[in-house]
Amino acid sequence: MRKTKLAVGLLCVMWAAQFAVAQIRTIEVLADKDSRYKIAGEKTPEIRVKAGESLLLRITARKAQSMSRDGSIHGFTLLHASDRSRVPGWDFTLKPGVQEFHVTAPSQPGEYVVVCTVICSDDHEGMNMKFVVEP
């Protein structure tokens, strides 16, 4: 009887661990033709995450005025707000349509900024968005 309870308990723990790993938050981003980032359901384009959180970025890119030679129409790069250095693993070029990226939020809490790295229009410099990592 004791072995049965132990086995059932172990199976429950294993199932719970698999379920916890499968829970990845999806963030819907629009890299729009007006050279602006937009977040589904939000008035202000800002992303807030927990340090080390697993994320699925689902980014829809719409063509602006121009594109790069490789067909990219926008970029999505995460920078440290303090010194504008790039965050490793957070540098994507976007082609028209929907693309998904599995990423892990930075482990260091603080303010970051998402910038477009493809010259997409005359207003390209305005294509940025606040990104906050909470403890």
Segments predicted by a language model, with ranges:
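Bacterial N-terminal signal peptides that target proteins for export
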Residues: 1-8
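Extracytoplasmic copper-binding redox domains, predominantly the cupredoxin/blue-copper superfamily
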Residues: 20-135
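Bacterial N-terminal signal peptides
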Residues: 8-17
